Every structure is written in C-alpha cells, then in structure tokens.
Amino acid sequence: MGQKVHPNGIRLGIVKPWNATWFANTKDFADNLDGDFKVRQFLTKELSKASLSRIVIERPAKSIRVTIHTARPGVVIGKKGEDVEKLRTAVAKIAGVPAQINIAEVRKPELDAQLVGDSIASQLERRVMFRRAMKRAVQNAMRLGAKGIKVEVSGRLGGAEIARSEWYREGRVPLHTLRADIDYATSSAHTTYGVIGIKVWIFKGEILGGMPAATEAAEPKADKPKKQRKGRK
C-alpha cells in the first residue's frame, strides 16, 4: 500500500532524517512536544512570506536550537540581524529555555516539495489557472534535475460546483522503493470558492547508503540446443 502511507514517515531512519532530534524522559516528554508544536506554529505564522521549507528542532542541555530552512534567508535575518534576534527572543519565551536560531538556505526551491506546493497555492490565490500552475511547477522541477514529480490538486477547481481532483506526473515516482529519496509535502490555497488542497511528490534519485551499485553485468547463460521438430512427410 505504498500509495496510502505517508512517504516521509515510512522513510524515517532509512533515507529521511527526523525534524526533531531530542530525547526526554516520561516527565518532560509532553512539555517538550508541546513546546515544539508552539514554536513551529509561531515560526510558520511569522515567516509566512519567507519561503519556509522545514524547521528542525534540537534540544541540547536545557536549551533549544532551531534550524530554519528557507529559500529567502535575507527575509528571515532582516536588516543587520534584527529580525532573527526578535525570533530568538520569542522562541526562548515560548520554549522557556535559552534559544539559538540557525538559518540554512535552500539552494534549489524548485526541487523542494514544500516550496513547490506553497508556490502553486499562492498562484491559485492570485487566480492563475490551476493547470498552468501545475505544469509550470512540473517543468521547472524536471529542468533542474528531478528524476520525477507528481502534483495533485483537489477542490472546487476553476470554481466548479462539484469538487474533483486532477494530477500531473512526469518521470517516475517509485513510492514502494524505500531507498528512493522522495520529498513529499502538502499545502492549501484559500480561494473565493473554498479551500483547494495541493500535494507534491518529488523523486530526486535513490540513496544506496554507501553500498556500491551493481555494475557488473550478469554472465549470459549458454543457450540450450533446441530440439528440432520433425516435419510431417
């Protein structure tokens, strides 16, 4: 059932890292989890225009370290680092421990599923035709080296009375292959007709984990001599 399971969740620990890396005992686990949720909620709201890809949270020795992956680091940092300092103070207040914020730049936003989904959502909210937005996203991803991409939108497409789903795919997206590096994300566009959901799968290639790929061709087997059939006289 590779079509149904979450592509990121099934690959955790195989080819995908966790978005939160910390360990806590039973007493502190719920507080840490709640703190993570509030920090993510706050940063997602504050940085809604900063092309936010993902937020990674670590908790070393009674502190919190947040790494923000974004395609527009200048917007997050602000003039002379003022904005990032405000974020650090706010995160420390929410989490209740000293905070440190790192910024990581996403070099190719066209190959990041979350950024592609958000881009399509913003286009739909600006009344761009959904087919044009989908095709443009697919073409840009393939042009920059993606092995495959699939984009699906669902809802009242084009203001139709009955909601439906449409999708485009180019290349291959092997959901069953666990070593396949598939980036998956969802987004939503709030239009005048209602909410349109967007799903994006991007296949970037297979991660073999240091194992050498089998390049030696198998030896051809000797063909067995075929028995000749006797023809009728």
UniProtKB/Swiss-Prot annotation:
One of its GO terms (biological process) is translation. InterPro entries: KH_dom, KH_dom-like_a/b, KH_dom_type_2, KH_sf_prok-type, Ribosomal_S3_C_sf, Ribosomal_uS3_bac-typ, Ribosomal_uS3_C, Ribosomal_uS3_CS. SMART domains: KH. It holds the Pfam family Ribosomal_S3_C. The keyword Ribosomal protein applies. Keywords: Ribonucleoprotein, Ribosomal protein, RNA-binding, rRNA-binding. Disulfide bonds: none annotated. Part of the 30S ribosomal subunit. Forms a tight complex with proteins S10 and S14. Binds the lower part of the 30S subunit head. Binds mRNA in the 70S ribosome, positioning it for translation. This is Small ribosomal subunit protein uS3. The gene is rpsC.
